[in-house]
């Protein structure tokens, strides 16, 4: 059995595509860089306007159509949003239950690039996020954060350790 995942920025997502995705894709990655000001700064259209207002309702509809399962809102944190725990909380406030956020990869000369001196702040944000998640869980508003979902019995990368990597056993590009 092959598992298929698709990643989308949501711009062209419509009812027909959503139906296809729900029928054919095991998982969907919905790319949203963060809060409105963060996303729109990093993902403007050619005319300079942001994509946030267009894509968020589409993503909410898709997440609901999948019963809040088998998808991830996937954000990116940069030097512009080292307070990325606020982006995750924003996603939760929008009703999303499956989330991930990754550090940007870029040349160190890029103004948004993460620098070595940012690492302590990033570590603080992960601690802050863990505490916020505990509070949300107590309030009955819990959600999953991909990078905190570790198999304590098998470790995070058993398949990769056994095969040398996830390539060919977990994913193809």
Where are these regions (language model features)?
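Hydrophobic transmembrane signal anchors and adjacent membrane-proximal interface regions, especially
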Residues: 15, 54-57
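Radical SAM enzyme [4Fe-4S]-AdoMet core and its adjacent flexible, acidic
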Residues: 37, 42-53, 60, 64-173
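A conserved non-catalytic segment of reverse transcriptases
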Residues: 28-29, 56-59
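Conserved SAM/AdoMet-binding glycine-rich loop
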Residues: 1-36
